[in-house]
Amino acid sequence: MTSEPRPTGRQAAAPGEAQIGRPKVVPKPWGEELWLAHTDRYAGKILAVKKGHRLSLQYHERKHEVQYIDSGRIKYTLGSSDRPGEYREFVAEAGTVVVLPPGTVHRMEALEDARFFEVSTPELDDIVRLEDDYGRAGPPAGRAGTSG
């Protein structure tokens, strides 16, 4: 007996039991996120960013991210939450891995349509927005907001 794939939930499959489904699609003003996994131990997403759009300038107090650029070119703006306003930029192309520990200020801008994978600790709402092109208000430091 077969069944249609369904959105995967927050809960991990029981030991020895596979979980088959479709990712949760989260529309964003800059593109979309496909949530592949979100458990109490880890999260995995694919982010698709439209050319010319960028995510918030942000940092996380607890969340640790690793990103893999699958396609396109992305301009990263990076800094430290301990040194406001001190940023450096670099362009990442397909095949690049970027590690963002807690406290790393970061922003990604798609120089062309781009897609990257993000594997992280599970704190998806741990975000402090410093700037945002889409008018989404950021919480003060120490309070959680919404991702991206």
Language-model segments: residues:
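Glycine- and acidic-residue-biased ligand/ion/polar-headgroup-sensing regions
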Residues: R62-S81
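A short glycine-rich, His/Asp/Glu-containing loop-to-beta-strand
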Residues: G21-K63
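Double-stranded beta-helix
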Residues: R10, G21-R22, V26-P27, E109-G148
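Cytosolic regulatory regions built on CNB/CRP/Popeye-like sensor folds
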Residues: T2-K24, T39, Y87-E89, A94
